[in-house]
UniProtKB/Swiss-Prot annotation:
GO terms for biological process: 'de novo' pyrimidine nucleobase biosynthetic process; 'de novo' UMP biosynthetic process; amino acid metabolic process. InterPro entries: Asp/Orn_carbamoyltranf_P-bd (IPR006132), Asp/Orn_carbamoylTrfase (IPR006130), Asp/Orn_carbamoylTrfase_sf (IPR036901), Asp_carbamoyltransf (IPR002082), Asp_carbamoyltransf_Asp/Orn-bd (IPR006131). Pfam families: OTCace, OTCace_N. Keywords: Pyrimidine biosynthesis, Transferase. This is Aspartate carbamoyltransferase catalytic subunit. It comes from Clostridium botulinum (strain Alaska E43 / Type E3). Belongs to the aspartate/ornithine carbamoyltransferase superfamily. ATCase family. Catalyzes the condensation of carbamoyl phosphate and aspartate to form carbamoyl aspartate and inorganic phosphate, the committed step in the de novo pyrimidine nucleotide biosynthesis pathway.
Length: 307
């Protein structure tokens, strides 16, 4: 049973539980009106201690489309956190007023801390450079919908593999499905952390290759996952500016790729995908954002036990 569980890490749910969520997401996609009142009377608390547009809107739209309501804040200055209130006290109070909480926080591990003090399910909407499990649900649902399942894919991940929480979560999640291989494309300074390389990939005998140019591997890729170089994760602006334009996907590079490859991106993008790529049938990132709302609808319905 998924009811009343917290979602802190993409590995918190078993493969079978994920299958259950995706099955419901499929049903919602086919007939959203059928589910428009399942959360009548339910309230989602949205605690965003860090700026967000897409993730916050996606959660709010998801709850509203299920018939529920939203309480929360989109920046800490508009909450009691600006007065010095502790995270634990905020969570205790908000869980009195709401039925489920989605929280984004800049500090790694904050969602886990929140789960210790909450009387309602906590959904981690991003904790620093650590985890972003609902983006992972979005990514998995997109792959399942557009690539006929979650196994036997060659997945190219390009850009910021060091600080990108979506990247770490995606590798962990896709490593659970058989036959997946990873092509990890980044400058040396932004390679995946050692714990991902050693504890997830090597420990589980998963095939992977680290390269520095997109052109040398793009023809082998089934799923290309692009990421932006995240300015907010850098302490040194000079280093950020040097690496910002490392990888730009354009029409010329797309001409080297498979006809049935899909291009994904967690968004927002800066300049790492040229706008000309938007018109390519393989560009899946806006469809991915749409699937994110359906994934969150299914997730919240399951956690609340209404379906």
């Amino acid at each position: 049973m998924i009811k009343d569980k917290h979602l802190i890490d993409p590995m918190d749910f078993t493969v079978e539980e994920l299958k259950e969520i995706f099955k419901l997401a499929h049903e919602i996609i086919l007939d959203p009106e059928k589910f428009s009142h399942v959360c009548d009377g339910k309230i989602l608390g949205t605690l965003f201690y860090e700026p967000s547009t897409r993730t916050r809107f996606s959660f709010e739209a998801a709850m509203m489309r299920l018939g529920g309501k939203i309480l929360g804040f989109s920046e800490p200055n508009s909450s009691s956190a600006s007065k010095g209130e502790s995270l634990s006290d905020t969570i205790k109070m908000v869980s009195i007023y709401t039925d489920i909480i989605a929280m984004r926080h800049p500090k790694e591990g904050s969602a886990k801390v929140a789960s210790l003090y909450s009387s309602v399910p906590i959904i981690n909407a991003g904790d620093g450079g650590h985890q972003h499990p609902t983006q992972t649900l979005t990514d998995l649902l997109t792959i399942e919908m557009l690539k006929d399942g979650l196994s036997n894919h060659t997945i190219g991940i390009c850009g910021d593999l060091k600080y990108g929480r979506t990247v770490h979560s995606l590798i962990k999640a896709m490593s659970r499905y058989k036959g997946n291989k990873f092509l990890l494309i980044s400058p040396k300074e932004l390679r995946i952390p050692d714990y991902i390389r050693e504890e997830i990939l090597r420990k589980n005998n998963i095939e992977f290759l680290e390269v520095e140019t997109l052109e040398e591997v793009i023809d082998k890729v089934d799923i290309l996952y692009m990421t932006r170089i995240q300015k907010e994760r850098f302490f040194n602006e000079e280093e950020y500016l040097r690496l910002r334009d490392s990888y730009i996907l354009n029409k010329e590079k797309m001409n080297l790729a498979k006809d049935d490859m899909i291009v994904m991106h967690p968004l927002p993008r800066v300049n790492e995908i040229a706008c000309e790529v938007d018109y390519d049938k393989r560009a899946a990132y806006f469809k991915q954002a749409e699937y994110g709302m359906y994934a969150r609808m299914a997730l919240m319905a399951k956690l609340l036990g209404v379906l």
